[in-house]
Amino acid sequence: MEDDDQQKAADLVQELVLRLVSQNPQTPNLDPNSPAFLKTLRYAFRILSSRLTPSVLPDATAIAESLKRRLATQGKSSDALAFADLYTKFASKTGPGSVNNKWALVYLLKIVSDDRKSAINGLDSSVLLPNLGIGDTGNGVLSRGEAKKKDWSNGVLLVSKDPENLRDIAFREYAILVKEENEVTEEVLVRDVLYASQGIDGKYVKFNSEIDGYAVQESVKVPRATRIMVRMLSELGWLFRKVKTFITESMDRFPAEDVGTVGQAFCAALQDELSDYYKLLAVLEAQAMNPIPLVSESASSNNYLSLRRLSVWFAEPMVKMRLMAVLVDKCKVLRGGAMAGAIHLHAQHGDPLVHDFMMSLLRCVCSPLFEMVRSWVLEGELEDTFGEFFVVGQPVKVDLLWREGYKLHPAMLPSFISPSLAQRILRTGKSINFLRVCCDDHGWADAASEAAAASGTTTRRGGLGYGETDALEHLVTEAAKRIDKHLLDVLYKRYKFKEHCLAIKRYLLLGQGDFVQYLMDIVGPKLSEPANNISSFELAGFLEAAIRASNAQYDDRDMLDRLRVKMMPHGSGDRGWDVFSLEYEARVPLDTVFTESVLSKYLRVFNFLWKLKRVEHALIGIWKTMKPNCITSNSFVKLQSSVKLQLLSALRRCQVLWNEMNHFVTNFQYYIMFEVLEVSWSNFSKEMEAAKDLDDLLAAHEKYLNAIVGKSLLGEQSQTIRESLFVLFELILRFRSHADRLYEGIHELQIRSKESGREKNKSQEPGSWISEGRKGLTQRAGEFLQSMSQDMDSIAKEYTSSLDGFLSLLPLQQSVDLKFLFFRLDFTEFYSRLHSKG
């Protein structure tokens, strides 16, 4: 069939030449078998077999538009419309009998039209392309003058002045010279470069370990420029080999080693890119099968592959492969979020090609990471087998689940997720787990579904991906808002967190006054005994009695049952006052707030307040003994005036010292109860209402407790002033002991003085004041009062000195409230003047 087509084409060419030559008046009846005609026919075949092409793009539509515009500018609008209609019909005709190369035919008609116009205008068309003709001369070509005289071109295609086609001969000689300088043809080198691009050694292009790359073997004779170009093109193979090796090694290590899901996704993304690369190489290999034409023929052939064309084809794959090789080097020792973050840094690029490529790669790589975020935020599930997520879980006790159960792993936090967003992600998942594990609550599922609906995402897998950071932040914000609100509602309503805080304030911080006073009254005598002789069960009975005798009996029974007596570790010399304390039992989930360390702080505050209450109770006891109606001066009329003066002086000294101590204790207790406890509670209540999540609640409670500890002089920085305060407490308790002895002695002296006249014979016991008579009574009374006065003076001096030291330390404290305490204690500047005189 192909031979028939060729013969048909040859016959058509012969007929065309015969008709053209027959138009020459000199040869009207030319014999087709004559030597002159055969020479002309061979010349025509040389023209047709040449590679000469026009210097315009093969665009039929452009040629047609050019012709239509030309007709329109010449004022031939009707011809332009007719041409446009004819061309539309011509271009739309397809199938058998239609012209395949429509552009060539339209271009031919254009050239014929231009040639005829040139002939009409008297131009020498042979100047452009001499006509094909047969003359009488020996070479068979008409002279230029004859052609002009005869003027018979009539639009015949004119060829160059090179009837012997010398340019084609020169091109062929150049091709022969190139072949002599190269042992290997360019087609072979192209195929070898394609092999090298797949990491395979070719026949002449092989991997050279010395230069760490592919290159033409030194023994092969090729031009230096060709060798350099092959080396540059083969860089793609070196990069491919690097990427392919990384993928293979990573897959070989899985699942024995922790490649991780992000690492697997990275390998899958690289493999997808290599698959596209393989497709490109398949296309190039198909083109490489076509021979490379000569330089003179190159313009008419498109489906061949040379080294220069290969460099154009390799431009885009080279950029991508270089990026992949850089990422492979960067990610060899990375995994999880760290790997995703490292890849993300390379996506910040101004080149659209690089940016789009990295975005496509990151969408695949970050898919497992975003799935972990979705699962954690909406389900509280930590699906992280290989430790790739930036949230890390660890086994802990239930009470430590919120504080220590989950932490951020900064090394695994990708750079496209901000630290604040990571904290919200961490807290949201923690809230779900806290509700599920500690609160035994499942209402979080509805809150998570509402959050997903509000953010426009789905609760199913694949709902989020790289490049959707705003959508992720919106989802996390909505989920955190709803789940945290649900968590606080559960704590406040179901577990009565506020009520428990108030119960601790009433009983551990001694805010329930009647309960504290009654407990102090009934337990005080028992606590004066040695600690080893006191039973905790007996003290628990006292506690229950105090509850029943006060308004505490109307509180929630569950909260009262949590209040227990605790005996602290003690030695042989400790009294009950030193070891007695109350504790509050915190159960799940409240033990997340009231941890052991928090309860230990409450214990310290209770012990401090209990000491303060004990001192206040002691001063009240002294006042009850000192009431004026207990002692009348008429009872001592029979005593000597000196002894009576000693008695009045001792009583007055005792009352003055009591007033000083009572002034200090009253103002200090007012400061503790109102400016410390009540103010701190008021602030805590406001912050508790404003809390948006459990972290806010924990921070508010910690701030509340730290404020109490700091303002109550229980902090580490207040150790010196606290020791000074405890010295004052000890002096007040010593004063209580001496005051009791004084009034016991006075009471006995009062009784003996009344009975001295009536019962002289009844009180003859050895050592009795009365047994020695009135003189002896007076002497013993004087000695007793003198001793008590000395003790009172000693306590007064120590108290004044200690109080002065305490007041001097108050202005040095950081808390402003303590400075106001100084103003309350020394509002008349009595101690300041006393200190300045001293």
Swiss-Prot record:
Induction: Up-regulated in galls upon nematode infection. Gamma-tubulin complex is necessary for microtubule nucleation at the microtubule organizing centers (MTOCs). Required for the positioning of the gamma-tubulin-containing complex on pre-existing microtubules and for the proper organization of cortical arrays. Gamma-tubulin complex is essential for the control of microtubular network remodeling in the course of initiation and development of giant-feeding cells, and for the successful reproduction of nematodes (e.g. Meloidogyne spp.) in their plant hosts. This is Gamma-tubulin complex component 3. The gene is GCP3. It is found in: Cytoplasm, Cytoskeleton, Microtubule organizing center; Nucleus envelope; Cytoplasm; Cytoplasm, Cell cortex. GO terms for biological process: microtubule nucleation; positive regulation of microtubule nucleation; response to nematode. Residues 200-256 are annotated as: Triggers nucleus envelope localization. Residues 1-199 are annotated as: Mediates interactions with GIP1 and GIP2. GO terms for molecular function: gamma-tubulin binding; tubulin binding.
